[in-house]
Amino acid sequence: MFWNYATECRRERQWVGGVVWLVTVNLLAAQQCVGQVDPYHRNLLQLGYDHPLRGQGPRGAYGYYYYNNPEIIGTNIALRLAIAPAYLDGEFGFRQLFSPTTDFGVGFYGGAYGENYYEVRQGNYRRKESFDGHGGGLALSVYQLLNPGMLIPLNVVARGGMKYSGYEGNSSTSDDFELPDGRPTAFVRGGLRLAGKEPILYPDLGLEVSAWAERQWRLNDGTYGFDDDRGVNPKSDLYWAYAGLDYSWTNVGHKISFATTIGDSETVDRFSAWRLGGVLPLIAEFPLILPGYYYQELTARRFLHLYASYVFPLGAGNRFQFRLEGAGALVDYLEGFEQPDPWQSGVGCGLTFTPKGKNYRVVLRYGYGFGAIRNNGDEGGHSVGILFQYDFERHWRRTGN
């Protein structure tokens, strides 16, 4: 009922052979996620990698299989799964459980490396202060449609749950760095969402306007680090609003995208503050993209983020396309993560190939970050990457299987 191009992407992270694997399953603009009951069959393989050419920051990557069956049991029970090498995220959705306009979801997620933390200050990736994290949790969601029968759906979303996070050092963590204690975290989130976007790579059409608020309670706060020089706050509040549009002229192969996100917070720490940087579009439900920057390079209390892209064809058939994009953010940094300039921006380009059957898409891309601090305090960050999506549903329709 609700999906109508509403997306759900939870960001999770896994360290495999020195590469950060991001399991993009539900929203992690603020740790937990808001999924929605999806009425479409989906079988998607998503891969993405972003590699910095200057500096040694965290490398963003994701790899997962996305499965959705809207009628797994009868006609009113749906199952969504996102499966990565060491992490699983899913939700059972019960359509019209309480009323014809009310859906209910039971979410579950967990595995290894989903709570990793990467310390980046002033462009310096501090491996000795970074560590691995594991855990999982459960969540309950209610999705209430406010305008049944209207072309563009307006939904109220309420979600609450509990997760547990445990931490351990990796091969680079300093022996003198005291790790944070394992802890349970409770959370509640509420939001108002108009329309939404599909959970696919660069959708042709999409519209969303939404506003959200979240409260997190850490049931085991305290201090950690070098001589207990940093702490975990007992509670944090997050607020954000988003507006985005994707529109394509499919007959000529041109496409535009615009998005703006504004975020604020109260009593946040390193684990709950906003993180900006990187370019992978499926890294989060509301990706705070900055081309040329490391993944999660900037840590903020509040921000204003702007993004735009333009795509045009290269030759007949629209199989090859060239992509131009730019992003900027006005940032109020978390204490200890300040940089000389509150304005950060980057530009990027990419070459896209989509076959006639549109069962897969490949994107080769480059990004440059104007204010990214690199070696010796110089500014300017470069990155290259690749994105890949394979749609098994389209393949099966083409082959008749």
Describe each PLM feature range.
Residues F2, Q31-G110, N116-Y117, R183-L205, ...:
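Outer-membrane beta-barrel initiation region
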Residues G17-A29:
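Bacterial N-terminal signal peptides
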Residues C33-R42, T185-P340, A372-N401:
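C-terminal outer-membrane beta-barrel translocator/porin domains of Gram-negative envelope proteins
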Residues L45-L47, I77-L81, V106-G110, L154-G160, ...:
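Membrane-embedded beta-strand positions of outer-membrane beta-barrel proteins
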Residues Y49-G55, Y67-N69, L81-Y87, F108-N116, ...:
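Transmembrane beta-strands of outer-membrane beta-barrel pores
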Residues D50-R54, I77-A82, Y125-F131, L145-G149, ...:
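Outer-membrane beta-barrel domain signature
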Residues R59-G63, L88-F92, H134-L140, A186-L192, ...:
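Hydrophobic, lipid-facing positions within transmembrane beta-strands of outer-membrane proteins
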Residues G107-G149, G169, Y360-G385:
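Outer-membrane beta-barrel translocator/channel fold
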